[in-house]
Amino acid sequence: MRPVKLSAAATVDLTKEYFEKNDILLIPTIVVIDDKEYWDDYENITPRFLYDTMKEGKLPTTSSNPIMSYYEHWKKYVDEGYDIVHMDLSSGLSGTYNNAVMAAKMIEDEVGEKRVYVPDTLAASCGEALILDAANDLKNEGKSASEIHYWIVENRLRANHWFTLSDFSHLFRGGRVSRTKMILGSALNIYPIMRMDVEGKLVQKKNTRGSKKAFKTLVDIMEQRADGGKDYNKKVFITHSDYLEGAEEVEKLIKKKFKNAESIEIHDLHQIGVHTGPGTVSIFFWGEERID
């Protein structure tokens, strides 16, 4: 059995230190500002830079990673004898997954056998991080690339993603809400509760009014869906887009209710924050499978 090299796009919203500590290959992702491409590797651009840019009235966008970017990052490890398992943003949110699949096929055609596995995570942000972290545990247990790939496909829908946000304008810009909903949402202090569906797409579940109600709703949903309910003993990730105080408030609620959680980590949103805009808070945990 060949050794396994894990690979993940920067959309997982972890840290450079995490990748270095666990010897995981980080694939930078592209953010476009004023027609200039920036490669986000957690150093070239920062969340602070992104959100300050938005406050200046500029509208950053994202772009799918080129096929050759994946190929060039992976080929040297394949040549060194590794099999690779790569985790990327859901195919339901971006075309970058398809580019990764094509790069893997290029390598397969070149070397004559499958060496790069690209499961569709159907995840985003720290939902990807949950899966990556589990894959790293499996690698350390000595599992093969094909076994890790199989586990991800079988368990990916258990990675729960729940979001809320305070600003509808970026959802309107992305075509996810109508102009009427944007205006009413802002006027009525609506905080939508959103989640990932079975196709790995971001969908709205319900509306709440005010941040306190929204944060409580997120934690109540976690109690209903998390493995073990209040006895949940696995990792929890919280992300935010320029809304640290909101993330810390959710962290307090989770600590109060889930006293056995293995760890609770807060991270900045990178690429997903480009689409949701400032004011987003999200939670990620292992729990019941998404069914719709």
PLM features per residue range, with description:
Residues R2-K5, T11-L25, I30, T96, ...:
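Mixed-charge interfacial surface used for oligomerization/domain docking
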Residues K5-S64, S69:
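N-terminal glycine-rich anion-binding loop in soluble enzyme alpha/beta folds
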Residues D34, G92, G200:
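Positions that flank functional sites
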Residues I45-Y51, W74, D79, M106:
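A short glycine/small-residue-enriched secondary-structure motif
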Residues K55-L93, N98, M102, H149:
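Glycine-rich phosphate- or other oxyanion-binding loops that anchor nucleotides, phosphorylated ligands
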Residues D88-S90, P119-L122:
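Short beta-strand->loop
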